[in-house]
Amino acid sequence: MAPCKYTPERVQMMWDAIAYNDSRRLAFMTDRPRWVHAHNFFDSAAQLFAYIVKNSISDVHVKPLEEGGREWVIDADFKDCADKAELMLKVNVGATAFMLFFEGKEDAVQRIMFSGNRGFHLWLKFCGKFKMDAPKSLREHWFNVFKQPAKLVSGDIRPGSFADCVRRAVHMYIGDAREDLVLRYWPDVDRDVFCNANKQIRAPFSYNYKGGDYSRCLTQQLQQRIKACSAGCLAGGTPPTSK
């Protein structure tokens, strides 16, 4: 039997990050691998950990609420990266673009997680405008806000738009903001995950067998980068403009 991929501490972090954790069904990938769907709820992180150990669990996914609905989760993947450094650069740029877009909106971002494979998951707070039971039409409206255009014209980018935020994020990490670079680093949001509230989603801090890594929180480091770059601009640094 392979060693357990989880510690009690990691399961506790995962448990604490799941809303309605004691009345929410979970789905599991075993080491074999195959999917297992637990029929009962878990009362505590300790009970969940015991289940994970007993069943040789690898991945943990959160299902929608019993009455329907699920958190708004922006799932963005970056394919064809040359190495881990390029992947994490694209993850940081893409996630930062969303942080900039939602900047000043306290009811928006809950957390941003590296998925453990090739992208990130941004969880939006469901106590504000992004309610769990929101209609699919509203989710699709927001998806279109984040959808990558076929081409960009710098003069047509409106301040505060998502395109503007991607451009600012690209400049923040690369020091350039040409249209081709903005399109290259534009985060590709999974429409199915974002728009369909009946889809299960990876639990924060869980293991990802595809990537061989754990989901981890990026929120604080992204906030620090934005703060540092903003201070640099105020001190006379170069603002994010296109070249």
UniProtKB/Swiss-Prot annotation:
- What does the sequence similarity comment in the record state about its family? Belongs to the baculoviridae LEF-1 family.
Tell me the function of this protein. Required for late and very late gene expression.
Give yes or no: UniProt keyword DNA damage.
no
Source organism superkingdom: Viruses
InterPro entries, alphabetized: DNA_primase_LEF1 (IPR016658)
Please name the GO terms of the biological process aspect recorded for this protein, alphabetically. viral genome replication
Its name, as the record gives it, is Late expression factor 1
* An example Gene Ontology molecular-function term: DNA-directed RNA polymerase activity
Q: Which keywords, in A-to-Z order, does the entry hold?
A: Early protein, Transcription, Transcription regulation
Does the record carry Oxidoreductase as a key word? no
